[in-house]
Amino acid sequence: MQELYADVIIDISHEAIDRAFQYVIPEKLVSQIRTGCQVNIPFGRGNTMRTGYVIGISDRTEYDRTKMKTIDSVCTEGIAAPGRLVALAGWIKENYGSTMINALQTVMPVKKTVRSVVVRYVALAVDETDEIEYKYMKRNARAKLRLLRTLKGENIIPMSKVTGELGVSSATVKAMQEEGVITVTEDSCYRKVTSDAVRKEAFMAPDIELNDIQMSIINEFQDDVDKDVHRTYLLHGVTGSGKTEVYVQCIRRVIEQGKQAIVLIPEIALTYQTIKYFTRYFGERVTVVNSRLSSGERYDQFERAKKGDVDVVIGPRSALFTPFERLGLIIIDEEHESSYKSDNPPKYHARETAIERARLEGASVILGSATPSVESYKKAMSGEFRLWTMDERVSDRKMADTSIVDLREELRRGNRSIISDELAEDITDRLSRHEQIMLFINKRGFNSFVSCRN
């Protein structure tokens, strides 16, 4: 058998070793090692055991075979990154000046396996129960009788109900199991990341009549999907113009093609309302991924995505790296938001990274915003992106009245307050009607304080 070699990135973030080291793949591990998997390797003069990521496999080497080291083992708890995400990590490294290990760890939000949640079930193992029931009654075995009668009606019940609601001890269950009356089975299940209230909304979406502009956009997207054309679209729509309805319909077209979609939102705080909205259309085939989930919950959602158990994943930046096998569409809502730019190395931008992942996967990207970023708008105007414009609100809803007040005029009139006379009058008017008011203070903007004196 021809010897194979693996290019391995060491799990140490340091520029001095920010390159691939080639190791021999032992024959016993050939079937287990593939691009993206984690391996244990001897490293350095002392052959200290380190973890590394395989980023390539070859049957050739430029090094002296007698001086090469051999991979020790495959990490049993490690998670392999799909090959395309490894390629994306390489792109992040080159474009954002990070180390390869940092880039790999970025595209792998879940790095270790987590023990599955195991649910135990109790079921009847016999068809005829009359004699057994009579025997339990004669012995006054109340707990056994209670469980037997419950199983006659439900056939199979979770162990949690047996020991909780029915008050049957584990010893009693074991005794009935030894008698051959019942069987106990185990089944792994995914951790729930959405509330019961959200799950009740499944497929409860109202019938919405799309307007001509929405239909025109959706039909164009459908034509591109049918022709296997993949591009980046900028959906420039005013607030309330129905961009979310367009997202839903475009996702439907992608799912009909047997593919999957990622929806990025700028803030975790928007997760609840977003997941609730999409659940109405896609039921439990939609899930959420964000940093508020436990490691087990995140692991389960990525496993669901990898196995094709979900069609839509919603979340902030990190959701971009969901390991879908058949990714067809990435949607970035409020694409102008600064939160899509990572503050930690590698300081990647989710918008640009999404476009690159779409290129690698053969997918499309929709950037949505009422106020697009200058970069995206320029690319749309130059033809690099396809521009969709929605300049009217749905159902003839009017735009909110907006007033711009020049505080320099207020100063000339002697008003040195941060509240203009017009704003003070409007506040007084609304309070007199027992209405509520929201005042936004610019403390998180580019300039936290502005005072114009002339």
Show where each model-derived region lies:
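Conserved interdomain linker/interface between the two RecA-like ATPase lobes of SF2 helicase motors
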Residues: 356-368, 373-444, 448-453
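Accessory, non-ATPase domains that flank or precede helicase/AAA+ motor cores in DNA-metabolism machines
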Residues: 1-369, 381-397, 431-432
